[in-house]
UniProtKB/Swiss-Prot annotation:
Family, as annotated: Belongs to the acetyltransferase family.
Gene3D superfamilies: 3.40.630.30
Record flagged with keyword Transmembrane helix: no
Classification via CDD domains: NAT_SF
Chain ranges of the N-acetyltransferase domain: 3-144
Record's keyword annotation contains Transferase: yes
Stated name of the protein: Peptidyl-lysine N-acetyltransferase YjaB
NCBIfam families from the UniProt entry: PRK10514.1
UniProt-listed Enzyme Commission number(s): 2.3.1.-
Gene: yjaB
Covalent S-S links between cysteines: none
Length: 147
């Protein structure tokens, strides 16, 4: 699969929300159903307008996306149908080309993501007992140190 990175388009907002939903459903089974719904509502409210970087396949179909704020990657979500095909790595490499001191946070219970980040060169630099909304889902703070 050939992956390209481009900016998101407003008209593909629903498609990106669908990727978020499939990705979260595949990796975040630790979330309560109520909180999962709350997060989806929040994502639906801001994702179509967010300045995302989108990974697309040869047909220009989105297969993943990330949100980068300065040196911090706020979000990275990959369609589970293409997990293991290098989409996440390509997005991280793109982020590093713009933000060489890249940091991110990941849910501690999301073992797949924790393993991915360590594999591509991140190390744990801290831990929070709660997520960004103050809910009891611990976050690991990560910084890129090189693969």
């Amino acid at each position: 699969m050939v992956i390209s990175i481009r900016r998101s388009r407003h008209e593909e907002g629903e498609e990106l929300v669908a990727i978020w939903c499939r990705s979260v459903d595949a990796t975040h089974d630790f979330l309560s159903a109520e909180y999962r719904t709350e997060l989806e509502d929040l994502v639906r409210s801001f994702l179509p307008e967010a300045p995302l970087w989108v990974a697309v396949n040869e047909r220009d179909q989105p297969v993943g996306f990330m949100l980068l704020s300065g040196q911090h990657m706020d979000a990275l979500f990959i369609d589970p149908d293409v997990r293991g095909c290098g989409v996440g790595r390509v997005l991280v490499e793109h982020a590093l080309s713009m933000a060489p001191e890249l940091t991110t946070n990941v849910n501690e219970q999301n073992e797949q993501a924790v393993g991915f980040y360590k594999k591509v060169g991140f190390k744990v630099t801290g831990r929070s007992e709660v997520d960004d909304l103050g809910k009891p889902y611990p976050l690991l703070n990560l910084a890129y140190v090189g693969a």
